[in-house]
Amino acid sequence: MNIWQSTSIITWLLAPFSLLFWLVSQIRLFLFRKKILKSYRSPVPVLVVGNISVGGNGKTPVVVWLVEQLQQRGVKVGVISRGYGGKSKDFPQLVTNQSSAEMVGDEPVLIVQRTGVPLAISANRQQSIELLLNQFKLDLIVTDDGLQHYALQRDIEWVVVDGIRRFGNGFVLPAGGLRELPSRLQSVQAIICNGGKAQPNEHLMTLEPEFAVNLRTGEQKPITDFIGQECVAIAGIGHPPRFFNMLENLGVKLLKTQGFADHQAFEPAQLKALAAEQIPLLMTEKDAVKCRTFAQQNWWYVPVSAKFSPESTACLLEPILKRLGK
């Protein structure tokens, strides 16, 4: 939300509630650390990929990148997710290539389709881990989000920061967009900066598109084929302008853009009304998993891949591999 990027009279009116939010979260964290509130220790190491702010920071591309890197190095990895946006009430549940994004959430389906990783969803992280370990022999559990879920003990914490928006106005909810203060970053093992300019203690990540995929046929086109072409773009992610800016920076001529709420379910008529049949409709990969069943001929999704420097790649992976004895 733009209101969280600066301070205004609304910020100060909400500040007392932010103070209350911060106090409650600190008391809760203290109770977990003192073992007054129970937490679960997984039989295998747990790595959390999370953030300290709300909105799209790029966690899912990091999870996909991490899983692929570990798979290439022989690590048997599983992923757990809350399954935000899904309607299913059957938990815990394994997600497969045939799972419906409407039922289990868009991000879990995307991760499984990209990596083939064993993935379970549930609000109860312990149940998800136990389900995975009962069915797969795993070396490591990666949790997509859940930095503030202190009922799950963790061995490694990565935090993804939006390199453009950073920490907004610096307030926690509801006066600002932070779940925890930036001082929380002092205790994590890695800070990943998504775009913008990374600080000295951060690893810069870029999200790079290489091609577009037709939702109906699976045909792939180089993304350069859309340079100068008139298109319409939609994005139902945490921060839609990031996707639109990426397309415009590539040279795509956007006639219209439409942002939707993160994890929002789409109605066919809702999207068909946005673009004439001859105009390409571009969307994110996360949106595509919800639209394939009613996609039109000229609908395309643009997958992005996380890219790190060789130095950052080594710095991020070596502590994990060392811990696992790989």
From Swiss-Prot:
Keywords: ATP-binding, Kinase, Lipid A biosynthesis, Lipid biosynthesis, Lipid metabolism, Nucleotide-binding, Transferase. The keyword Transferase applies. It comes from the Bacteria. GO terms for cellular component: plasma membrane. It catalyses: a lipid A disaccharide + ATP = a lipid IVA + ADP + H(+). InterPro entries: LpxK, P-loop_NTPase. Pathway: Glycolipid biosynthesis; lipid IV(A) biosynthesis; lipid IV(A) from (3R)-3-hydroxytetradecanoyl-[acyl-carrier-protein] and UDP-N-acetyl-alpha-D-glucosamine: step 6/6. GO terms for molecular function: ATP binding; tetraacyldisaccharide 4'-kinase activity. The keyword Transmembrane helix does not apply. One of its GO terms (biological process) is lipid A biosynthetic process. ATP binds at S53, V54, G55, G56, N57, G58, K59, T60. Its EC number is 2.7.1.130. It is an enzyme of class 2 (transferase). Transfers the gamma-phosphate of ATP to the 4'-position of a tetraacyldisaccharide 1-phosphate intermediate (termed DS-1-P) to form tetraacyldisaccharide 1,4'-bis-phosphate (lipid IVA). Belongs to the LpxK family. NCBIfam families: lpxK. This is Tetraacyldisaccharide 4'-kinase. The gene is lpxK.
